[in-house]
Amino acid sequence: MQNQRIRIRLKAFDYRLIDQSTLEIVNTAKRTGAKVLGPIPLPTRKERFTILVSPHVNKDARDQYEIRTHKRLIDIVQPTEKTVDALMRLDLAAGVDVQISLG
């Protein structure tokens, strides 16, 4: 796996879950002898929704909600076979979306 790079993108609504998962990935990669770049925090996406409270009148009465999507990027440079095996066996939280690409 010479001159390979593994890029891992993580997405989650809860920043604590994504930080915990990031720490697990980084520790696993370093323990198996790979060089790790990151974690790099990417911009947080904020979706805002405004909903009318009243079904008929009172246009001024509204509720506002927000969903924040936190993102992190990790690059693993010069991964070993042990690194790939350890990352495949890693058990992460259910609320974290993981995208892995080889480059």
Curated annotation (Swiss-Prot):
One of its GO terms (biological process) is translation. Keywords: Ribonucleoprotein, Ribosomal protein. InterPro entries: Ribosomal_uS10, Ribosomal_uS10_CS, Ribosomal_uS10_dom, Ribosomal_uS10_dom_sf. It comes from the Bacteria. GO terms for molecular function: structural constituent of ribosome; tRNA binding. Pfam families: Ribosomal_S10. GO terms for cellular component: ribonucleoprotein complex; ribosome. Involved in the binding of tRNA to the ribosomes. Part of the 30S ribosomal subunit. Belongs to the universal ribosomal protein uS10 family. This is Small ribosomal subunit protein uS10. It comes from Buchnera aphidicola subsp. Cinara cedri (strain Cc). The gene is rpsJ.
